UniProtKB/Swiss-Prot annotation:
Annotated protein name in UniProt: Protein NrdI
Source organism superkingdom: Bacteria
Family label: Belongs to the NrdI family.
HAMAP family noted in UniProt: NrdI
GO biological process: protein modification process
Gene Ontology MF, one: FMN binding
InterPro entries named among the record's database cross-references: Flavoprotein-like_sf, RNR_Ib_NrdI_bac, RNR_NrdI
Function: Probably involved in ribonucleotide reductase function.
Length: 140
């Protein structure tokens, strides 16, 4: 299973480089088309007010990528990265993409992940490659 990922500070890129999975980086300058199943790994940059939470503009490339030529139709699941110190907006972008496209949020980790996180994502990818089924549950 291929990983499609977006990295702002390099944390997500460092995580992906620790896996043995094929991958492609989402950048603001590309129109990247996916024609095979993939897992999306996205960090979260969001703002929160008393009435609304939303991803900030720096995350637009993730939303653009998912919409481009219906890439979202090939996405088998979403993995969120973030910092738990941000409490209510921890992995918010992953939750927002999951809800928008009704794609399961499958896993989350902090910063650039631990060896256990790498193993868990590789196992998850292998299970999906072997036909494991997952169901959507709205994370918001």
């Amino acid at each position: 299973m291929k990983l499609a990922y977006f990295s702002v500070t390099g944390q997500t890129r460092r995580f992906v480089s620790k896996t043995d999975l094929p991958n492609v980086e989402i950048t603001p300058d590309d129109d990247l088309e996916m024609d095979e199943p993939f897992l999306l790994i996205t960090p979260s940059y969001a703002e929160e007010s008393p009435t609304v939470s939303k991803s900030i503009d720096v995350m637009d490339p993730v939303f653009d990528f998912m919409a481009y030529n219906d890439n979202y139709k090939h996405c088998r699941g979403i993995i969120g990265t973030g910092n738990r110190n941000f409490a209510g907006i921890y992995i918010f972008t992953a939750k927002e993409v999951s809800a928008k496209y009704q794609i399961p949020l499958l896993y989350d980790f902090e910063f650039n992940g631990t060896p256990a996180d790498v193993a868990a994502v590789e196992k998850l990818a292998a299970q999906l490659d072997q036909g494991a089924k997952v169901t959507f549950k709205n994370p918001l």
